A protein has these predicted regions:
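Acidic, metal/ion-coordinating pockets
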Residues: 1-262
Length: 262
């Protein structure tokens, strides 16, 4: 199970509350969430990580907002379940991938950021290629999940096809809107351009809508954005893999809030 960007307290508390039942209902072996917006919409803290882990999260991925809460710099150096984008500079604290030993086998999670309309980072295609060459799906590793935190749809789609047949799931994050293109690619990799956010969709991508709308209309600075506090929708994707580690089944998850549920 993969859940998209958690935005703010209301979404965080709903994920913590609902995740145990979701894991039981869907017989989930491994749960991943993107937590980069979980602290008031900006970054993540040690306490939030611990709450998510306690609720049943196995791995937390992030993105460009990771360092918005500076306390996480020390924590990430000693917590291998919390990932930062793998194409950050090599001396950056933390790791961009981890191999998890589970009862069902080894699961490799890779967190990578795109470069189109984003920060200038190392080439995500090259870095992912190196990791997949050294960790072959179905031989060295039983399942591989890649979180592509990127702005451009084209870059996410291209990365999906580039990894097709070499990963179990390639799923996009960052734009906070779930796409309707969940599919199994030609060579067996599950794919969705964006998992969407876990947050209140009566908002502007998770933020209380008054200030973002005002800024678009008036083109002037104003108050700090704050997460919307209405009923959150839990958004993500669930896959089943076969003995080769490829995707046999993929389905979107939307639960609660103003979006239609799956």
């Amino acid at each position: 199970m993969y859940l998209g960007d958690i935005v703010g307290r209301a979404a965080r508390e709903k994920v913590v509350r609902e995740l145990p039942d979701l894991k039981s209902e869907y017989l989930v072996d491994f749960a991943i969430v993107n937590g980069e917006n979980s602290a008031g919409g900006f970054g993540i803290t040690e306490d939030i990580c611990k709450d998510l882990f306690s609720s049943g999260v196995d791995c937390i991925t992030t993105g460009n907002h990771l360092w918005d809460q500076r306390e996480i710099l020390d924590f990430i150096s000693n917590e291998d379940r919390l990932l930062r984008p793998v194409n950050f500079p090599s001396h950056t604290p933390g790791s961009g991938f981890n191999i998890f030993e589970t009862e069902k086998g080894k699961i490799l999670v890779i967190n990578v950021m795109g470069r189109l309309f984003m920060d200038p980072l190392d080439d995500p295609f090259r870095i992912i290629d190196e990791l997949l060459i050294n960790n072959e799906l179905g031989k060295d590793i039983d399942a591989i999940v890649i979180d592509v935190h990127a702005e451009a749809t084209s870059e996410k789609v291209a990365l999906g096809h580039y990894c097709d047949g070499r990963a179990s799931l390639v799923v996009g994050t960052h734009t906070h809107i779930p796409t309707a293109d969940h599919q199994i690619l030609q060579f067996g990799t599950g794919y969705q351009t964006d998992a969407g956010m876990c947050g209140d969709y009566d908002s502007v991508i998770g933020m209380e809508k008054t200030e973002p709308v005002r800024r678009f209309v008036e083109k002037t600075p104003g108050n700090r954005f704050s997460p919307a506090q209405g009923d959150a929708t839990i958004c993500g994707v669930i896959i089943e893999t076969n003995d080769d580690g490829l995707c046999d089944k993929i389905e979107p998850l939307r639960l609660g809030g103003v979006l239609s549920s799956t």
